């Protein structure tokens, strides 16, 4: 195996993080990105770490599993977390970012590193004799995807991700909406569009009957629950949306609200939330409204939402295939291929789901590729940490029922001793244990 540099294929969240981790350890990196020469169905730019779905990196508190994961990544000097904090926009208790500023930051930090060489080229085969991380994401080009399937000897799985629409803030009718975060956590960063029972019923019926965009050559519809199209939720039953993105709990009308309401009820029957999408607050996305309706149908149906009667859509919701590997059979916890030690995979193609989780996989793969380059022992983060629980889960779960996974406390190893009944107290203890463990690993492995 030649060891003059490490290849990273793909400059998304995982690839960018991996390249950064390798370069900061003094190892030359060649990062290949085809965007700029050839676009995917979902990306709009050639920038690194472009966010194509939501602009939220989810919960910030360490009593939330993804918040704990972000804190672990921060301590491991993650470029993705640095970018997110630098370009943060108001989002209550969540970490949301200005999309363009975020991608600009990552592109600049990675591509300007003196040990990083950026090559705009489509890779169509798997390098055999060089250390390589493949992090081409769920929209891997057909030619490389076929080589990966051929290499792994398995067809893998596939499903669809759906992105929510983005609207112009100036087109919102603020007489019918109010600002509030659920349970008044943090600042009142969300715009809430309340619905009466009659409005909700009409909206659900319109969603069910709306015409969907054709799925082209895509295969069987296998939707990951975390990014389910809103029209699919509507079809699942009357209350599915009320317990999902349109949940009204904790979003009571403010006393100063003068818009339409259901009688004297303090809480709306249903609520559609809008979340700030950029730093200037000129754009808002419709939270949880991923969709693959035809664009004309999106305008017709979503303008039924109170306050959005004249909404101008900056981007309509779109849907794309999202393929991932049979990681339980194909990968080690280090994100190395079981078949070829010098080959790593990272990002959503491994079955981790979400921006933060994808970046975390790139971080682990990057650290271990650097270890391998230097003839050092690779690092296996324990499942008592959030960053260790994900690779453990995707490599140890039942292959027959394997589906993409977000980080949750359910996959982090339980505390020793009697179970603490209070969730917040229990998760606080889990987070403390995790961060203490990580501190020891950082010191022992010289990972800072």
From Swiss-Prot:
Its cofactor is FAD. InterPro entries: FAD/NAD-bd_sf, MnmG-rel, MnmG-rel_CS, MnmG_N, TrmFO. FAD binds at residues 10-15. GO terms for molecular function: flavin adenine dinucleotide binding; tRNA (uracil(54)-C5)-methyltransferase activity, 5,10-methylenetetrahydrofolate-dependent. Coiled coil: none annotated. It catalyses: uridine(54) in tRNA + (6R)-5,10-methylene-5,6,7,8-tetrahydrofolate + NADH + H(+) = 5-methyluridine(54) in tRNA + (6S)-5,6,7,8-tetrahydrofolate + NAD(+); uridine(54) in tRNA + (6R)-5,10-methylene-5,6,7,8-tetrahydrofolate + NADPH + H(+) = 5-methyluridine(54) in tRNA + (6S)-5,6,7,8-tetrahydrofolate + NADP(+). The keyword DNA damage does not apply. Keywords: Cytoplasm, FAD, Flavoprotein, Methyltransferase, NAD, NADP, Transferase, tRNA processing. Its main location: cytoplasm. Disulfide bonds: none annotated. It holds the Pfam family GIDA. The keyword Mitochondrion does not apply. Gene3D superfamilies: FAD/NAD(P)-binding domain. Its EC number is 2.1.1.74. It is found in: Cytoplasm. One of its GO terms (cellular component) is cytosol. Belongs to the MnmG family. TrmFO subfamily. Catalyzes the folate-dependent formation of 5-methyl-uridine at position 54 (M-5-U54) in all tRNAs. PANTHER family: GLUCOSE INHIBITED DIVISION PROTEIN A (PTHR11806), METHYLENETETRAHYDROFOLATE--TRNA-(URACIL-5-)-METHYLTRANSFERASE TRMFO (PTHR11806:SF2). This is Methylenetetrahydrofolate--tRNA-(uracil-5-)-methyltransferase TrmFO.
């Amino acid at each position: 195996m030649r060891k003059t540099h490490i290849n990273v294929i793909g400059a998304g969240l995982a690839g960018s993080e991996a390249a950064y981790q390798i370069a900061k350890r003094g190892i030359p990196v060649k990062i290949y990105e085809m965007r700029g020469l050839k676009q995917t169905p979902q990306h709009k730019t050639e920038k690194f770490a472009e966010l194509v779905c939501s602009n939220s990196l989810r919960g910030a508190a360490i009593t939330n599993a993804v918040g704990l994961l972000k804190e672990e990544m921060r301590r491991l000097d993650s470029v993705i977390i640095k970018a997110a904090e630098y370009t943060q926009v108001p989002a209550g208790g969540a970490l949301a970012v200005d999309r363009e500023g975020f991608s600009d930051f990552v592109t600049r930090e990675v591509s300007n590193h003196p040990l990083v060489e950026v090559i705009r080229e489509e890779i169509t085969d798997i390098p055999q004799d060089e250390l390589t991380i493949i992090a081409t994401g769920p929209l891997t080009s057909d030619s490389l995807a076929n080589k990966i399937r051929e290499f792994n000897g398995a067809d893998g799985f596939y499903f669809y991700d759906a992105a929510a629409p983005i609207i112009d803030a100036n087109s919102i009718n603020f007489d019918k909406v109010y600002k509030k975060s659920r349970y008044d956590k943090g600042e009142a960063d969300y715009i809430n569009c309340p619905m009466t029972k009659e409005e909700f019923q009409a909206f659900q019926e319109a969603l069910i009957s709306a015409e969907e965009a054709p799925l082209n050559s895509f295969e069987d519809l296998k939707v990951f629950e975390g990014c389910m199209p809103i029209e699919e939720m509507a079809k699942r039953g009357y209350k599915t949306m009320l317990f999902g993105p349109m949940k009204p709990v904790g979003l009571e009308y403010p006393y100063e609200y003068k818009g339409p309401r259901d009688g004297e009820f303090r809480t709306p029957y249903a609520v559609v939330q809008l979340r700030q999408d950029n730093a200037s607050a000129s754009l808002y996305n419709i939270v949880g409204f991923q969709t693959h309706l035809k664009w004309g149908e999106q305008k017709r149906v979503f303008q039924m939402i109170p306050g959005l009667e004249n909404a101008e859509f900056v981007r309509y919701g779109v849907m794309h295939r999202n393929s991932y590997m049979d990681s339980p059979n194909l990968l080690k916890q280090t994100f190395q291929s079981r078949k070829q030690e010098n080959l790593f995979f990272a990002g959503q193609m491994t079955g981790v789901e979400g921006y933060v989780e994808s970046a975390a996989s790139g971080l682990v793969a990057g650290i271990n590729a650097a270890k391998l380059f230097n003839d050092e022992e690779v690092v296996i983060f324990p499942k008592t940490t959030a960053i260790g629980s994900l690779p453990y889960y995707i490599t140890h779960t039942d292959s027959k029922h394997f589906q993409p996974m977000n980080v949750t406390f359910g996959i982090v190893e339980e505390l020793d001793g009697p179970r603490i009944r209070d969730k917040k107290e229990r998760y606080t203890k889990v987070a403390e244990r995790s961060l203490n463990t990580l501190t020891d690993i950082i010191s022992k492995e010289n990972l800072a």
